[in-house]
Amino acid sequence: MSLGAWEVKVSTNFPQKVATGIAQLDEQIIGAEYDAVAYLGSQVVNGTNHAVLAQQTILTGRDTKNAVVLVFNEKPKTIEVALASINTIVKGNNEPGGIDVNVTTEIPAEAKAALDAALKGFVGSKVEAFAYIGKQVTKGIDYIFACEVTPVVQDPVKTISLVKVHSIDNTLEFKALFSDEKNNTKLGYAFTW
């Protein structure tokens, strides 16, 4: 891994300092709750940044849910991590046609079937869903996943992407969050469909 680049390393196990930081979030932030789902990777820059996929619940009368990437920073020679940023990657909306966010690593059977159907015959990249983000009812049902996408080439650059499956016609839409690429130092976010 080169200095400043993200190293993709998806896991449902969190480094100890990151797990402690996650546990303290609900005490530190008023008006929202966070449910961490997956560790996405790390970046070495001014210490070590750690990216975590989570569900954010805004505590209002409607309890809106969003998919977010939490970035924690671990400074050298410190015993804890600090929350550096909260990046909204999918905004939930309780209105008709809005995205019903329910971030989980337990992918619902109907969503998995839609993804499998859309990936049938798909070539060029290996797409592995590690989390279900939610669904949207428009013309048919669209499902959104967090996936590891690895091109089928020599020396592939793995990417963490949001993948939207349009189940009515079995098509896919990709939005990259970040990758292993040497020069990729930014975490992309704030997507709206």
List each language-model region with its residue ranges.
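N- and C-terminal low-complexity/disordered segments
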Residues: 1-193
